[in-house]
């Protein structure tokens, strides 16, 4: 396994699984979604806000505001199980009527090639 992917995976596991109580507390404190590796433009295409790796917690009340993932153009054209549609679940969270209030445990301006440290 690639060392960067191993660090990335361990960071996501620590922040979304091992520290699940922190996730729940932060959602209870007002965040719409919590996780690691929240990316926004210019690191992503204009209008795309994603948890890279798709490992996050979100409030059901926020998820209910999102359009159905089945309404995404690529999924309509290629199907939900198509390789072409593989990133649609990542972009779905950030493509609703408003951007979620996010707690990113990895911190702002993270660099995917330098994720040797992980918080909290």
PLM region descriptions:
Residues 1-120:
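ER/Golgi luminal nucleotide-sugar-dependent glycosyltransferases, focusing on the catalytic module
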């Amino acid at each position: 396994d690639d060392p960067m992917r191993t660090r990335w995976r361990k960071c996501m596991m620590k922040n979304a699984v091992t520290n699940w109580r922190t996730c729940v507390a932060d959602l209870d404190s007002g965040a719409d979604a919590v996780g690691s590796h929240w990316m926004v433009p210019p690191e992503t295409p204009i209008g795309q806000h994603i948890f890279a790796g798709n490992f996050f917690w979100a409030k059901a009340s926020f998820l209910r505001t999102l359009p159905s993932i089945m309404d995404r153009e690529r999924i309509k054209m290629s199907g939900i199980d198509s390789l072409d549609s593989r990133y649609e679940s990542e972009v779905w969270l950030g493509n609703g009527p408003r951007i979620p209030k996010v707690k990113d445990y990895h911190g702002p301006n993270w660099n995917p090639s330098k994720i040797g440290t992980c918080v909290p």
